[in-house]
Design a protein with these regions (language model features):
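Glycine/threonine-rich phosphate-binding loop and adjacent beta-strand/alpha-helix elements that clamp
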Residues: 9-281
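Catalytic-core region of carbohydrate-active enzymes that cleave or remodel glycosidic bonds
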Residues: 1-9
Length: 281
C-alpha cells in the first residue's frame, strides 16, 4: 500500500495507475499457495460453475442428482448439531469466487432455524488443515430461514441477495428451499483431496465479554512503523475494573434454533453446492 499512499498523498509519479485492478491469492493447505496472481476481473470470466448434489444416503456430494429422496437430520440443541457431506477430487481443481448452497430444509419442532455453512479442504485421508492460529481454513456462510426472501432484481445464480424486509416463519411440516450465500474464497485441491461441506445449527457467540480484561501493547506515539524497528510501546488493558457502562453492554443474541433440523436431498429436493471451478490455462 505504500506506493498507493505515495502516489495519492505525496503526488509521487510511481506508475500506480498501471497496477493491475485484480490480484488474488489461492490457498493450498498442505501445498504451495498461489500469491498475488494478476487477473482482469472478479469474479473471473473463465469460471465454470459446477453443481455438487448432496446425498443424505451416504453423506456424499456428486455431480449428478441422486434419484432417491433421503433426509439428514440433527438435534439443534445437541453437542454436535451438524451433518457433513464429502466429495473426493478426481483431478487437480481450483475453486475461486463466490459459492452458494441451495438447500431444502424443515424444522418440525419450531418456526425458524439459524444455519452455519462451512466449505473446507481435507487431506487425502480425511484430516483437516489448520492455520497458525489453530483454526481450520474454510469459506463460511450463515442463514436464518425466516429471512430467506430474495431480492430478485439483484440476485444471480451464484450470489443471492436478501430483502431483509419480510419475516417468513416456517409452518409445521413445511419444506422450503434456502439460497445460502458463502463467502468467496480461492482454494486449490490436489487429486484425491476432499472437499467437505458442513451444515450445522448456528450458535451465537457470547457478546458480553469483560471490557479491559485483555492486555495489549501499542506504539506509544500512535504511529505505524516498519517491522524490526524498535519503538516505545505502552500496554493497555489487563484490569477488569476498567469496564464499560453496564447499560452499554451488548447482550448475546437469542438463538432461533429448537428441536430437530431436517435436510432433504435427491429426487424432488435438488440440494446442491454451487462451486466456481477455474479451468487450467
Amino acid at each position: 500500500l505504500r506506493r498507493f499512499f505515495d502516489h495519492y498523498l505525496k503526488n509521487i509519479d510511481n506508475g500506480w495507475e498501471q497496477t493491475p485492478k485484480v490480484r488474488l491469492s489461492v490457498l493450498n493447505p498442505g501445498g504451495k499457495n498461489i500469491v498475488n496472481r494478476v487477473e482482469n476481473e472478479f469474479p473471473l470470466a473463465r469460471t465454470k460453475y459446477t453443481k455438487l448434489y448432496l446425498s443424505a444416503a451416504d453423506s456424499s456430494l456428486s455431480t449428478s442428482l441422486p434419484q432417491k429422496e433421503t433426509i439428514s437430520s440433527y438435534q439443534s440443541e445437541s453437542r454436535q448439531p451438524k451433518v457433513t457431506y464429502r466429495f473426493r477430487m478426481t483431478k487437480s481443481t481450483e475453486i475461486t469466487g463466490y459459492m452458494k448452497l441451495h438447500l431444502w430444509v424443515s424444522a418440525p419442532d419450531h418456526d425458524d432455524m439459524d444455519l452455519a455453512i462451512k466449505v473446507e479442504k481435507l487431506s487425502k485421508d480425511g484430516k483437516p488443515f489448520f492455520d497458525p492460529t489453530g483454526a481450520t481454513i474454510a469459506a463460511t456462510g450463515y442463514m436464518r430461514a425466516s429471512m430467506r426472501q430474495l431480492d430478485t432484481l439483484r440476485t444471480t445464480e451464484a450470489e443471492p441477495y436478501y430483502t431483509y424486509t419480510t419475516e417468513q416463519k416456517l409452518k409445521p411440516g413445511e419444506i422450503v428451499p434456502l439460497e445460502i450465500e458463502i463467502w468467496p474464497m480461492g482454494l486449490m485441491f490436489d487429486k484425491d483431496e476432499i472437499l467437505q461441506l458442513t451444515v450445522e445449527a448456528y450458535r451465537p457467540a457470547a457478546a458480553a465479554i469483560p471490557f479491559g480484561s485483555a492486555r495489549i501493547s501499542i506504539p506509544k506515539e500512535g504511529y505505524t512503523y516498519q517491522p524490526g524497528n524498535n519503538v516505545d510501546l505502552v500496554t493497555l488493558g489487563g484490569n477488569e475494573n476498567q469496564c464499560a457502562d453496564p447499560n452499554e453492554v451488548v447482550t448475546s443474541p437469542a438463538t432461533h434454533n429448537a428441536g430437530k433440523h431436517c435436510i432433504y436431498t435427491g429426487g424432488r429436493y435438488d440440494s446442491y453446492l454451487y462451486l466456481p471451478v477455474i479451468p487450467e490455462k
